[in-house]
């Protein structure tokens, strides 16, 4: 499974995730920090990446909008807001457990929550 971190996810999640073998790209790396939420999800969808965010309300709504307009995406994982930088390892562990449960294939329109 391939992941895309939006601009609100701590960059340590990227660093730790990669060190543990996850295929992760951040919005910072591809110069997408200024994109709107729909554009972030469009980017992730176009690249077959499951988007990871802390922006629960907007991305739940966007997932429904994409589904109702037949615009597939590779899923959205929502992590808790207000995590400290020290929580990045717990977030990555939750992502690894998620991949173990779900397998390596993304699920169109999936919106799920990770506990870290």
PLM region spans:
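Short beta->alpha connector loops at strand-helix junctions that form conserved
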Residues: 28, 55, 80
């Amino acid at each position: 499974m391939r992941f895309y971190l939006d601009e609100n996810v701590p960059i340590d999640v990227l660093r730790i995730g990669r060190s543990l073998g996850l295929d992760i790209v951040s919005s910072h790396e591809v110069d997408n920090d200024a994109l709107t939420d729909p554009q972030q999800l469009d980017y992730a969808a176009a690249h077959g990446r499951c988007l990871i965010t802390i922006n629960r309300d907007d991305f739940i709504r966007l997932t429904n909008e994409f589904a109702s307009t037949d615009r597939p995406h590779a899923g959205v994982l929502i992590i808790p807001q207000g995590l400290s930088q020290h929580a990045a390892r717990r977030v990555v562990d939750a992502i690894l457990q998620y991949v173990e449960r779900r397998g390596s294939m993304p699920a169109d329109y999936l919106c799920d929550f990770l506990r870290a």
